[in-house]
Amino acid sequence: MAVSLIAYGLGLFLKKKLKWAFLNPLLLSIIFVILFLQVFQIDYETYNETARYLSYLLTPATVCLAIPLYQQLKLLKENLLAVVLVIVSGVIASMGGIFVLALAFGLNHEQYVTLLPKSITTAIGIGVSEELHGITTITVAVIIVTGVLGNVIAELVFKLFRIQEPIAKGLALGTSAHAIGTSKALELGEIEGAMSSLSIAVAGILTVVGASIFANLIP
């Protein structure tokens, strides 16, 4: 567990020191841990015996994201319909995109359902993957890559498409890049963080329901 915490702390230090967008602390910590295990010839099972305790914090950490949402409750009520439509559209676009890619690359059912939960938080994504008989280890990897990518390119995309509305930024990050995207949203502002936090919960619920429907499209 200490290795994971030190690796993440080092990732944060490098991000703050160098201020490069692609130096995501989570991505760096993964690389550091892999290198550590390889150099000292430590097998994953031994490492995971202690590191798994950090996984127990995933769910309460996600629940804590409701705090900024509560602080922006009035704004949410004023834009409720637009918020719901954006999240629903984002979830459909995410799973629809996976369906199209699966057809294009000839993925089988197991590979296809493994990728369906890519845009929701790990705690929910693992459950969806298991329920649909996907490969959970790959699902976790895909979820992390999706979140890191969303975190890294978010500001570039916003500038490219001239997106300035805080609500739109928050919804986009939360719906497409789950908790890792929400960390970027919180950096951008309180409104962005609140909307992104809401998106995680709603997108997770919609994906749980919608994934079973999309899963049947490729037998």
Feature locations, PLM:
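Alpha-helical membrane segments and immediately flanking helix-loop junctions
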Residues: Q111-I138, I144-T146, L160, Q164-V202
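Helical membrane-embedded segments and adjacent short helical loop/helix-boundary regions
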Residues: M1-S4, Y8-P68, E78-A82, V86, ...
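Short juxtamembrane and helix-loop transition motifs at transmembrane-helix boundaries
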Residues: L12-W20, I42-R52, Y70-L81, A102-L107, ...
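Hydrophobic transmembrane alpha-helical segments of multi-pass transport and channel proteins
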Residues: V148-I153, G204-V209, I213
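Small-residue-rich segments of transmembrane alpha-helices in multi-pass membrane proteins
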Residues: L27-V39, T59-C64, L85-G97, L116-I126, ...
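Transmembrane alpha-helices that form the ion-translocation and gating core
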Residues: L85-A123, T146-F161
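Juxtamembrane boundary at the C-terminal end of a transmembrane helix
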Residues: L103, G210-P219
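Entry/N-cap segments of selected transmembrane alpha helices
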Residues: M1-V3, L73-I98, V140-L149, S199-G204
